């Protein structure tokens, strides 16, 4: 179960918004790069985000270049989950691979900045504790949940020696 406060973003949040190019020199120091996460989309996000917070966004979250560190620095910043109308496919896979849950939900427009959410990944239920509304989404497949439970694919492979059975 995931529980956290919402940070609301719009459509087409790109990997350039997530990890601004002017900080590319920090790509080998992800803790430092995370101090600038999403600052081109919301200036003081990195300073105010707290461990467990949840990003809620519109369509096509994570479009752009295939920067694995984009998903990783969101996680390092403390975000516990991203909920969006849709994701760029490469970002979706990168997020799962680094152990960051991502959920597609068409009703994101009904969720507001600062709302408190509770998310059950296994059963596909998102509860807005602020409004009392409950939403259903396609549950994350079991093999991806196994990767998330191990905090990413590298940790999964270290522990189990091979990929999860599909």
Swiss-Prot record:
GO biological process: L-leucine biosynthetic process
GO molecular function list: 3-isopropylmalate dehydratase activity
Disulfide bonds: none
Any Pfam family the entry gives: Aconitase_C
InterPro entries: Aconitase/3IPM_dehydase_swvl, AconitaseA/IPMdHydase_ssu_swvl, IPMI_Swivel, LeuD, LeuD_type2/HacB/DmdB
Alphabetical keyword list: Amino-acid biosynthesis, Branched-chain amino acid biosynthesis, Leucine biosynthesis, Lyase
Pathway: Amino-acid biosynthesis; L-leucine biosynthesis; L-leucine from 3-methyl-2-oxobutanoate: step 2/4
Catalytic activity: (2R,3S)-3-isopropylmalate = (2S)-2-isopropylmalate
Enzyme kind, highest EC tier: lyase
EC number, UniProt record: 4.2.1.33
Keyword check for Amino-acid biosynthesis: yes
Function: Catalyzes the isomerization between 2-isopropylmalate and 3-isopropylmalate, via the formation of 2-isopropylmaleate.
Family: Belongs to the LeuD family. LeuD type 2 subfamily.
Subunit and partners: Heterodimer of LeuC and LeuD.
Name of this chain's protein: 3-isopropylmalate dehydratase small subunit 1
Species, as recorded: Thermotoga maritima (strain ATCC 43589 / DSM 3109 / JCM 10099 / NBRC 100826 / MSB8)
